Swiss-Prot record:
Organism annotation: Parageobacillus thermoglucosidasius
Biased composition (Low complexity): 571-586
NCBIfam families, alphabetized: PRK00290.1, prok_dnaK
UniProtKB keywords: ATP-binding, Chaperone, Nucleotide-binding, Phosphoprotein, Stress response
Protein function: Acts as a chaperone.
Family of this protein: Belongs to the heat shock protein 70 family.
Pfam families: HSP70
UniProt region (Disordered), positions on chain: 571-607
UniProt protein name: Chaperone protein DnaK
Induction note: By stress conditions e.g. heat shock.
Lineage start: Bacteria, Bacillati, Bacillota, Bacilli, Bacillales
Length: 607
């Protein structure tokens, strides 16, 4: 059975890990990095993952995770792509280098999502996995995964708060750990708050400064904006270690007097002033989670930081102020989520024993009832998997159909919450209002995905749906995307093989030239000429870039070079033999002058 890999599919960076010999291990990408940028670019029909070329290539997609579970589509080279398809391209890349590392096909994965992801976003993530050719064994919340990674080897019982500030999402979860049980007590968050927003405040500041100074709005210039984004991200990272940084962007724009540049110093104090409202926004969910769990800051034993943005000093200071304790720095915030996902994979595969994970649903679930009211059936922070039923009735006399409008959220009115789906229960026997009894049952599985069924208790007629949001994909669409992804994977494989073949052919040309110099005058000139012609033919094929021709010419040259090498060795062996014979003759001549003598051992008895 294939290994189950753990994937942290992040807004800005992704990471993949696997359990090896009971130990979780992060798999580095082909460039040797332990995290991979969640960036997809298209160039002349070719898909490039993790190449940060947004400056030069307008067909570059970043932070697609922010659009998961929506009907957003991005048009590239005349084709529209859903967020699921773009995410699948990233997942395919992670899968491919995990396969190279493990030396076997990978078909199963545990993928993490922000704890505050709703049903549509979770379903979209699962679909992305399927499109990438992965059986998604479990969707697991990022803070829960981090807690798994942190707490696996901890003996004592403790209550931990996981503060997860990623590139585009923010979550807080409070868990109780003890005897291998990881129980989530409460979770809260904001799906539109992350490191990208901290970059944005620096960008806005630089744009405003430049506008005041030169009267030019850089936010209208796509290439300038991308350069600003890169500079802002770099400045943000540098300010985690130093108190001021230099932002230098030459030739960012031009006016009638000539080129214009940005040359400015950004201090940590200024950055903290610009981002203070964002840091404060993260404190709301922290307080909410504590309240929902019925705890005070004093009840928290450890604060675990997850996500690259938690390196920002102001963030760490705010946590310290709010919770009265130093955050724990013993985990790598970029890798801990993927490691936790790999551990959960090990739990599912039976490799990790005595670990029980009890997660919760982040948002309340219910249906719309008379007057547009949102009636909750499952409250937020209920442990999953779970099932809950409630009996409803008709609102009008002789009503024969009931519309079931399924929602997720916390607001009292249905219109203010997120619609997950609608379905109808039909053929209800006509009766006065309030007489029919309709039982609505909600099931939430371990992935946090919702299934709903409605049953008329009078006729036992039942109607059920697995929620498909308006942005959800139909089975036909998923199958089509899987097929396209496989075709692209095949095209990528062929491209990779072609690149490897060209490299091998180049190397063979180089070594042949070297060999020909060595054999000159040592083997028959006709053989050398034959090899030289074959080498030139391969060079010509390389210039034409005809893969089949390169393969043929390479094989032909390899054979000739092998024959040359054999002849060279034969020649060398003959020479060595001739030298040995000459040496043996000389030794025999020397032996003629040797006189044999007898000797006698004399014993000295006086000693």
């Amino acid at each position: 059975m294939s290994k189950i890999i753990g994937i942290d599919l992040g807004t800005t960076n992704s990471c993949v890990a696997v359990l090896e010999g009971g130990e979780p291990k992060v798999i580095p990408n082909p460039e040797g990095s332990r995290t991979t940028p969640s960036v997809v670019a298209f160039k002349n029909g070719e898909r490039l993952v993790a190449k940060r070329q947004a400056i030069t290539n307008p067909n570059t997609i970043i932070s697609i995770k922010r659009h998961m579970g929506t009907d957003y589509k991005v048009e590239i080279e005349g084709k529209k792509y859903t967020p699921q398809e773009i995410s699948a391209i990233i997942l395919q890349y992670l899968k491919s280098y995990a396969e190279d590392y493990l030396g076997e096909p990978v078909t199963r994965a545990v993928i993490t999502v922000p704890a505050y992801f709703n049903d549509a976003q979770r379903q979209a993530t699962k679909d992305a996995g399927r499109i990438a050719g992965l059986q998604v064994e479990r969707i697991i919340n990022e803070p829960t995964a981090a807690a798994l990674a942190y707490g696996l080897d901890k003996e004592e019982d403790q209550t931990i708060l996981v503060y997860d500030l990623g590139g585009g999402t923010f979550d807080v979860s409070i868990l109780e750990l003890g005897d291998g049980v990881f129980e989530v007590k409460a979770t809260a968050g904001d799906n539109h708050l992350g490191g990208d927003d901290f970059d944005q405040v620096i960008i806005d500041y630089l744009v405003e400064q430049f506008k005041q100074e030169h009267g030019i709005d850089l936010s209208k210039d796509k290439m300038a904006l991308q350069r600003l984004k890169d500079a802002a991200e770099k400045a943000k990272k540098e300010l985690s270690g130093v108190t001021q940084t230099q932002i230098s962007l030459p030739f960012i724009s031009a006016n009638e007097t000539g080129p214009l540049h940005i040359e400015t110093t950004l201090t940590r104090a200024k950055f903290e002033e610009l981002s203070a409202h964002l840091v404060e926004r993260t404190m709301g969910p922290v307080r909410q989670a504590l309240q929902d769990a019925g705890l005070t800051p004093a009840d928290i034993d450890k604060v675990i930081l997850v996500g690259g943005s938690t390196r920002i000093p102001a963030v760490q200071e705010a946590i310290k102020r709010e919770l009265g304790k130093e955050p724990h720095k013993g985990v790598n915030p970029d890798e801990v989520v993927a490691i936790g996902a790999a551990i959960q994979g090990g739990v599912i595969a039976g490799e990790v024993k005595d670990v029980v994970l009890l997660d919760v649903t982040p948002l309340s679930l219910g249906i719309e009832t008379m007057g547009g009211v949102f009636t909750k059936l499952i409250e937020r922070n209920t442990t999953i998997p779970t099932s809950k039923s409630q009996i409803f009735t008709t609102a009008a006399d002789n009503q024969t159909t009931v519309d079931i409008h399924v929602l997720q959220g916390e607001r009292p009115m249905a219109a203010d919450n997120k619609t997950l789906g609608r379905f109808q229960l039909t053929d209800i026997p006509p009766a006065p209002r309030g007489v029919p009894q309709i039982e609505v049952t909600f099931d939430i599985d371990a992935n946090g995905i919702v299934h709903v069924r409605a049953k008329d208790l009078g006729t036992n007629k039942e109607q059920s749906i697995t929620i498909k949001s308006s942005s959800g994909l139909s089975e036909e669409e998923i199958q089509r995307m899987i097929k396209e992804a496989e075709e692209n994977a095949e095209a990528d494989r062929k491209r990779k093989e072609a690149a490897e073949l060209r490299n091998e052919a180049d190397h063979l040309v180089f070594t042949t030239e070297k060999t020909l110099k060595e054999v000159e005058g040592k083997v028959d000139e006709a053989e050398v000429k034959k090899a030289r012609e074959a080498k030139d033919a391969l060079k010509a094929a390389l210039e034409k870039n005809d893969i089949d021709d390169i393969r043929k010419k390479k094989e032909a040259l390899q054979e000739i070079v092998q024959q040359l090498s054999v002849k060279l060795y034969e020649q060398a062996a003959k020479q060595a033999q001739a030298q040995q014979q000459t040496g043996a003759g000389d030794a025999a001549k020397k032996d003629d002058n040797v006189v044999d003598a007898e000797f006698e051992e004399v014993k000295d008895d006086n000693k």
